[in-house]
From Swiss-Prot:
Species name: Escherichia coli (strain K12)
Disrupted gene: phenotype observed: A double cydA/cydB deletion shows increased sensitivity to reductant (beta-mercapoethanol).
E.C. number(s) listed in UniProt: 7.1.1.7
Compartment(s): Cell inner membrane
Lineage of producing organism: Bacteria, Pseudomonadati, Pseudomonadota, Gammaproteobacteria, Enterobacterales
Protein name, entry field: Cytochrome bd-I ubiquinol oxidase subunit 1
UniProt xrefs under InterPro entries: Cyt-d_ubiquinol_oxidase_su_1
Length: 522
C-alpha cells in the first residue's frame, strides 16, 4: 500500500494532469481568437467574425472547465502539503497571489465581455477585449510558472533558522529566474501549438466532409500559419530548456538521458535504450555521437555529469547536511555562539540533503551508514519513466512539426484541402499536443524528485499529517468529479464541433442552408 507521501503525490499529480488537459487549449485559442477578430476588424468580412464567435464557443467551454479544475490544486498546498506551505509559503505564495489578483481577474472579467459584448461594444473595442483575454491567460501562466520555476531552481531566497522558513531576498530575481522564464515561454508555446492543432484538425474534418469549405479553409490557414511559428518556437525553446537544465538541474538531465557514467566530452545522445536502475546501466542503447554534449552544454569540451558521479557528490552533501542539521539544533536550543552561527551559514546550502535522512530516522545527525547510503540512492529519480516520457514528448513534437509544416506549405501554395491524406493527418493528429504536454509536465515534475523544492525541501517531509483514508476518499471524490468535467467537456466539444458554424444560427452554414436562402458568408 502507498504511504501518506506517495498518496499525496498521486493526488496532486492526478489533479494537475487533469487540469493541464484544459490549460494549453485556453492559452492557444485565446491568441487565435484575437488574430481572427483582428482580421475581421481590418477586412470587414463577416466570415472572420463568424470564425471568432464559433471558435470562441469552444474556447468558452474549455475555459470554464479549466477554471473549475484549477481551484482545488491551490487548496492542496494547505490540506496535503502543510509543511511545504509553512516552509516556503512566503515565497511560493507571492506569485500565486499576484496571479489571482491581477491575471485571473483580468482574464475572467474580459471573458465575460468577449461573450456578451458583441452587440454592446464597437468593433475595435471588442477586438481589444479579445486581446486582453489572451494577455490575461498568458499572465496567469507567467506567475504560475514563476512559482514552479522557483521550485525547480530556488534562487532569490534564504533559510532563516529563527523562523525555520525560507524567506525571499529579491522579488526581481525571483521573477527573472532563468528556469522560470524558459519554462514560461516553452509552456505557452506548447499551448499555442495545441490551439492551432485543435482548429487545424476540426477544420480539416469539415473539408473532408465537404461542408462549410470557405469557413474551414480560412480557419485552417490561420491555424497553420500560427501553428508553424508556434511549433518552431517550442522546439527552439525546448533546446533552451535543455541547456538551462544542464546548468542548474544536472541530476534531472542525467536521468532523462539515462546517463549513468560521465562520458568524455562531448557526450553522446542515447536515441533509444533500456535503462536498468538496479544495475545502474542501460541494457541496450542506440547513440548519436556528440549530440547530448552539444545540446546540453553548447560546447565540445564540457562533460555531462553522469548519475554515478552525481550520487558521489550527493553523499558528500548528505554528510554535510547532517552537520548543518546538528548546528541548527544547537542554534534552535538557544546557542549564541557566533562561531556556530557562522559555521551553520557556511553549510546550510546542504541542509536539504540532510533532510533526505528524515525518511529513515528522526535524528538526522546520528544517521547510520546504511541510512546514508539509502538516502544517497533516493537522491536521484527513477530513470526509466523519465527516459521514456521525454522521448514520447519529443516524438510527438516532431510529428506535430511535420503535420503543421505540410499544412502551412499547402496554405502558401494556395492548395488547402487538395491532399486528403494531409487533412486526415491533421484530424488524427489532434491528440498529439496533449500527449506531448502531459509527458512534458511529467518530466518536469517527476524529474525534480526527491525534492519538493530543489535541493532545499525533500518531498518526504513536505506533507501534512493526514491518514491514508483521508487521502483515498478525497482522491476518489476529486478524480470522480474531474472525470465528470472531462466527459462534459468532450460531450460539448463534440456536439458543437459537429454542428460547426451552424451553431451560430446565422442561416449561412451547412445545416441551415437547406431551410434558408441566406448566402454563405464571405
Amino acid at each position: 500500500m502507498l504511504d501518506i507521501v506517495e498518496l499525496s503525490r498521486l493526488q496532486f499529480a492526478l489533479t494537475a494532469m487533469y487540469h493541464f488537459l484544459f490549460v494549453p487549449l485556453t492559452l492557444g485559442m485565446a491568441f487565435l481568437l484575437a488574430i481572427m477578430e483582428t482580421v475581421y476588424v481590418l477586412s470587414g468580412k463577416q466570415i472572420y467574425k463568424d470564425m471568432t464567435k464559433f471558435w470562441g464557443k469552444l474556447f468558452g467551454i474549455n475555459f470554464a472547465l479549466g477554471v473549475a479544475t484549477g481551484l482545488t490544486m491551490e487548496f492542496q498546498f494547505g490540506t496535503n502539503w502543510s509543511y511545504y506551505s509553512h516552509y516556503v509559503g512566503d515565497i511560493f505564495g507571492a506569485p500565486l497571489a499576484i496571479e489571482g489578483l491581477m491575471a485571473f481577474f483580468l482574464e475572467s472579467t474580459f471573458v465575460g465581455l468577449f461573450f456578451f459584448g458583441w452587440d454592446r461594444l464597437g468593433k475595435v473595442q471588442h477586438m481589444c477585449v479579445t486581446w486582453l483575454v489572451a494577455l490575461g491567460s498568458n499572465l496567469s501562466a507567467l506567475w504560475i510558472l514563476v512559482a514552479n520555476g522557483w521550485m525547480q531552481n530556488p534562487i532569490a531566497s534564504d533559510f532563516n533558522f529563527e523562523t525555520m522558513r525560507m524567506e525571499m531576498v529579491s522579488f526581481s530575481e525571483l521573477v527573472l529566474n532563468p528556469v522560470a522564464q524558459v519554462k514560461f515561454v516553452h509552456t505557452v508555446a506548447s499551448g499555442y501549438v495545441t490551439g492551432a492543432m485543435f482548429i487545424l484538425g476540426i477544420s480539416a474534418w469539415y473539408m473532408l466532409k465537404g461542408r462549410d469549405f470557405a469557413f474551414a479553409k480560412r480557419s485552417f490557414a490561420i491555424a497553420a500559419s500560427f501553428g508553424m511559428a508556434a511549433v518552431l518556437s517550442v522546439i527552439v525553446l525546448g533546446d533552451e530548456s535543455g541547456y538551462e537544465m544542464g546548468d542548474v538541474q544536472k541530476t534531472k538531465l542525467a536521468a532523462i538521458e539515462a546517463e549513468w557514467e560521465t562520458q568524455p566530452a562531448p557526450a553522446a545522445f542515447t536515441l533509444f535504450g533500456i535503462p536498468d536502475q538496479e544495475e545502474e546501466t542501460n541494457k541496450f542503447a542506440i547513440q548519436i555521437p556528440y549530440a547530448l554534449g552539444i545540446i546540453a552544454t553548447r560546447s565540445v569540451d564540457t562533460p555531462v555529469i553522469g548519475l554515478k558521479e552525481l550520487m558521489v557528490q550527493h553523499e558528500e552533501r548528505i554528510r554535510n547536511g547532517m552537520k548543518a542539521y546538528s548546528l541548527l539544533e544547537q542554534l534552535r536550543s538557544g546557542s549564541t555562539d557566533q562561531a556556530v552561527r557562522d559555521q551553520f551559514n557556511s553549510m546550510k546550502k546542504d541542509l536539504g540533503y540532510g533532510l533526505l535522512l528524515k525518511r529513515y530516522t528522526p535524528n538526522v545527525a546520528d544517521a547510520t551508514e546504511a541510512q546514508i547510503q539509502q538516502a544517497t540512492k533516493d537522491s536521484i529519480p527513477r530513470v526509466a519513466p523519465l527516459y521514456f516520457a521525454f522521448r514520447i514528448m519529443v516524438a510527438c513534437g516532431f510529428l506535430l512539426l511535420a503535420i503543421i509544416a505540410l499544412s502551412f506549405w499547402s496554405v502558401i501554395r494556395n492548395r488547402i484541402g487538395e491532399k486528403k491524406w494531409l487533412l486526415r493527418a491533421a484530424l488524427y493528429g489532434i491528440p498529439l499536443p496533449w500527449i506531448a504536454v502531459e509527458a512534458g509536465w511529467f518530466v518536469a515534475e517527476y524529474g525534480r524528485q526527491p525534492w519538493a523544492i530543489g535541493e532545499v525541501l525533500p518531498t518526504a517531509v513536505a506533507n501534512s499529517s493526514l491518514t491514508a483514508g483521508d487521502l483515498i476518499f478525497s482522491m476518489v471524490l476529486i478524480c470522480g468529479l474531474y472525470t465528470l468535467f472531462l466527459v462534459a467537456e468532450l460531450f460539448l466539444m463534440f456536439k458543437f464541433a459537429r454542428l460547426g458554424p451552424s451553431s451560430l444560427k446565422t442561416g449561412r452554414y451547412h445545416f441551415e442552408q437547406s431551410s434558408t436562402t441566406t448566402q454563405p458568408a464571405r
